UniProtKB/Swiss-Prot annotation:
Pfam families documented for this protein: SHIPPO-rpt
Domain of life of the organism encoding this protein: Eukaryota
Residue ranges of STPGR repeats: 21-34, 63-73, 97-107, 200-219, 250-263, 292-321, 334-353, 423-438, 473-483, 507-518
Transmembrane segments: none
Protein name (Swiss-Prot/TrEMBL): Sperm-tail PG-rich repeat-containing protein 2
The organism of origin for this protein: Rattus norvegicus (Rat)
Location of the region described as Disordered in the Swiss-Prot/TrEMBL record: 131-163
Entry keyword annotation includes Mitochondrion: no
Alphabetically ordered keywords of this record: Repeat
Amino acid sequence: MYDRAPRWLDLANRGSTEEHVGPGTYQVPFPKQQATGCYAPFLSLSSKKDAYVVSSDPGKAVPGPAHYNVSQAQYKIKGGRTLQNREKRFKKLISDGPGPASYDCPYLGTLCIRIRQKICRKPAVSRSLDIPSIPSSGKSHGYHLNEDDTIMRRTPPSSDKTMGPAYYNPQFDYPKASLKYKGVNFGIATGRQELLKYSGPGPGHYDIIQKRKLRYENINIKRDQEHYCYSYVPRLYEEIALQEEKKGVPGPGKYNIKSQFDHIKSMSTIVDASSLLFFPETERFEPIKSSTPAPGTYNETRTAFKVPKKRSGLFSPFGQRAARFTEDYKAHELPGPGFYDISTNIVKAQVKKPHLKKKMKTGFGSSVPRALFAVQEKAFAGPGPSDYQVVRGIHDELPNLMNKYAAFLSREERTTPVQEMSLPAPGCYDVQKSYDMSQVQHNYMPPRSSVAKQRHSSFLSAAPRCLGKISDGPGPATYNPILMKSGAIISFVKAPRRFEEFQDKFSPGPTTYELSPFFRHSLLKRTYNVTLPCSASLNREHAGHAVQKTRQKYQRERFKHPN
């Protein structure tokens, strides 16, 4: 409602600076924030313009109430617009202090000698007017400016010739409060949002029924690539897949086409020479095998597992054909990566029939292959003669001569049998489920039998299983058990004793005492709340019987002698 913008009047008080000016020579005046009061609206007690801008005519220098244009602020409709950031992003900072170009400093090294002259700081004489913008009553007729710059208030005229308020005709077509827009921001819009129309084909321009054309597809050229007007740039994941496909396809110089004049080496070297006529023992239908060798096919010649040249059995000494560094033959029981046939999903038969192989002459008359079933012949992973231990002692049993795979007719087994263990296999456990039940959720398995259901609550109790030694309670020797003697004749009906012996610490119950019939009938007929004296001893009970007898005797004598 009030325009409280401060007005700075310190520009008139500034003067010139001295010749030599440094950072600590001048002080930049900062305007003081005065407390604003509400007693004068529109800052009417402050000056309207700066003091040094004074016109010769006081009427032009100080505007009156009619000089303000209020219609621009009144008829400006606020609202109805979206929030727009109309403020500048980078503001231009203007300092109130003097800048670097305001000083005239001589350059160093010159012969310019200037006389220090102190510049007069006296400001120019100017007339200052301090007239409130809204005059109060009695001061609305203006002021008179004298020659000595003094201000005198004008007196009101004796008669007023102006028209009164009844002669004015203010035209208020509509109130200014109705000009304030109070709706939504898009309700003031006069235009209508139009849909964008594209110049594409309509629904009837398409040809749904397409004619089938016979296309000849080339492997190296993609189909329908001619209608692409842009180059095909694969994405990252597509480029990785394309590179992997290129690795599997060999290049132009990678093929080795065999000619019909090339000499083909024989692949079967272990077959006997007598069986080479017309190949009678060759397989009729050979399995489809991949020409790619398995990972364990090749032997590295640079390592210590290099196989020496074969010698005949007559010239090979003991242990000459054995491997120098033996491996663990237990680790080769399972087939390797190259032993599977993907087309038939079975393991390749690496061990052929013994009668198809050429009998090799070896020392000590042993014709058993050294390698295991799942290991190739040239691997030499099986144990040698030096790996066996001779069992000393005389054995009653004969050697197992029927075992054709026993090396050197040894009674020791080549492969130790796997003992059947009662422990389950590693894959039988569910580690995640057991961890969650024991550490996270603490859930117990439900009982699986009727007996377990009865005892299930005992395992869930919080009481300790083994109680400690209780020293406060009585011991076994404290009690005095009464031993009942078993009689020959069993009496089903037993009359209770009239006078029983009780212990000293015995407290009588409600049925311990018995009243006489005389007192019993009198209590039932005459009284309802009677507290009987409790007798803890048997003497008091006997005394009650004696009193009862004396009263009965006294009543009999009274009937006999009424006077």
